[in-house]
Amino acid sequence: MFKKLTLTLAAFCAAGIFAAEKAAIAYPGYSLEADKGGLVIKDGSGSRLLKIGRQLFSWAPPVAYPETVTQIAPDTLKVDYRIDKDKSGQVALSATFRATPEGTIFADYELTAPEGMKTGGIMQELQPIGVKKLPELFKSGLWTRDDNGGVPYEVRDGYFRGFQGKRASVWLQLGGNANYTSSWAEHLSYKKNESGKQSASCVFQLTPPGTTGAEAAALLRNRPLTLTLATGKPFNLWDSGVPEFTVNITNPGSQTQSGVELAVTARDYDGRSVLNEKRLLTLAPHQSETLKFQLPEAERMIWFAEASVKQGGKELLFTRTSLAVLPPHEFQDRENSRFGMSAYFPVPDMESVYKLMRRIGVRILRHGDNRECAKYGLLALDHANVPKAQDPSKDKARLDQILKRAMEFENPEIEFCNEWNMGLKPEFHRKYAERYAKLLRQFRQLCKERNSDIRIIGMGIAGDDPKFVRALAAAGAWEYFDGGIAMHPGRGNFTPDYEKNQWSYLGSIRRFKKVMGELGEKSIHLSEVYAATHANDWWKDSERQAAENVVLTYALGLAEGVASIQFYQLHDAVWHDIGGVNHKDSEYSYGLLRRDGAVKPSLLAYAAVAEQLDGAKFRKYLTFNDLHVKGVGFDTPRGPLAVVYDRTDGMVQSKKAPDFIHLEPWVDHWKTHREVTLPAISDEVTVIDSIGRATQVKAVDGKVTLTLSGAPLMVYGLQF
């Protein structure tokens, strides 16, 4: 707290800015001063915290050294840099640093560089002196209401790097690629400006020691409060008992916040309001309040919680999460399971992730280390890519690297390369198919030399793409696919049983199988199947649609006899931005879990369908007198299982529209719900919904009446 630094915001504002003999900006709580080789940030006692030094071009020879520091305004320093290793003689760099009484320092850089010089890798030297650089970024997302009334979503608020000290800390709002980092530098992203030069920026924030990332983000963004929901449980998941969560509200600033209206609500999957509480709070400077809330006990359920804050009747901010109960379950036929996971991240940690995947019924991993994951009953394959346009002289080293890892990780099969056909024009099919076949021959020879019996799964084909698949066979690749071939049946705004569109799930599988019949049967691995939940995107699922579509994805995949069905992916976000947020990019929304690991309905659906298809054998597709009723029949150790649903409302989930919105996950989106009478083999049938909740329905005279919609039900006790 700034009080601990012997100042408050009021003291800040009352203090005058002064310039020392050397260029400096000083406030009672901190100062920014010229220092040999750059600028230094000091705390109120004069202790050095962080030095801002050189800029290294990294991808080009020049290095920029701070040479002169000039005070151009009471609150602004200008730095001019000396450029070394500049053969062009055309590189120039200057920067301004504006420091405010609130502890914020705005750094703006302007670069002149000749055309062709690589400036994309420039790193700003930041030397921790009286602070320790935190290893984890704080990736701030700001929950936002949709202008059209759709579901709320997170917007990227900024990524923040912390430098924690005993008496003060410094937080940096990154101005570049968060992955370009080291113990002493951070990346700056230079972009061309209107003058033809290049600009970059970043922002520093002085804070009290112990300030969290959320509090630092609020200070940098001039928000008076922070608001977080937490459970302390991995994935916000319970196996029994009463779920509970905390709401933390903090005033990170130096002014009292009064009249703070806190509202906390929660709904279950059926739309019932199970929590609706309000508090009126006053928060002194740096005060934090944590409130605890409980949800009803349930055997299996998911809830959606929201906390919001208003002042003067205006909403300042809100946040959301989801919580669930998923009871324990042991799978009986794990060895033969075809349920897989295409990608996953260590959020919150790998042990928790492995345990979760075991619980929900995952058997096959697209990649992983069997020395670790085998302990959890998981079988890791390998997946590796060689860029299709890579310089062939680099192929041998890359192939050697791929095989070495697969042997070390004890992977029995490897999916060799990925989606070379994506966006590939037909006239290039032959060229790259022949390159791929050559790589396969090289890789197989390398396997022989290393005494490796690893099987090759042909590259994951984007969609069914029969022309490219035929080109692979013509080039001689087919004989090497002793592990089968992979395919990614991308699915648009259709239910999984739709067949007509190129980007339809069942349609892609059946078209792919037809090509297999022409070229020679190979086992098919669906190494990426999808139920993305990009908010208010007409091409993607809502969270409720995703849960329903996960059930059908696996039921239909098993019915079609594929070797594995690997869901893409466990977590939201992307591999190069784990835990990140980017509302503009749908790639961040493919998970069964939210970016922070919180459970989505689709995770419960994955567990539900895995439980019911444990040990199942496909019997037949079901037909009924009512042509709108569809079904898939399986024999299971628990008896005959029918996955049934109604298609009165069709298979197209949405229409393209600029103002398209998704419904909330607790809202049933099907227009038609019909009572349908079906033949039964017992006096009672068991009906299991998309998230795994079971109910018993009485049958009379060998018939049972079920209420059907487009949402699939898994039913034991039907005659077929």
Predicted segments with their positions:
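Beta-strand-rich N-terminal accessory domains
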Residues: 19-80, 100, 150-162, 166-167
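Polysaccharide-binding surfaces and accessory modules of carbohydrate-active proteins
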Residues: 21-23, 101, 106-176, 234
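Beta-strand-rich recognition/accessory modules
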Residues: 51-60, 84, 153-227, 267-269, ...
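Extended, loop-rich substrate-binding clefts of extracytoplasmic carbohydrate-active enzymes
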Residues: 55-116, 184, 207-213
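C-terminal beta-strand-rich structural cap/linker in extracellular carbohydrate-active enzymes
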Residues: 198-215, 696-720
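Carbohydrate-binding surface patches
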Residues: 246-250, 255-258, 623-681, 711-714
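Noncatalytic carbohydrate-binding groove/subsite architecture in carbohydrate-active enzymes
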Residues: 433-554, 560
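Aromatic/acidic polysaccharide-binding cleft in carbohydrate-active enzymes
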Residues: 531-606, 621-627
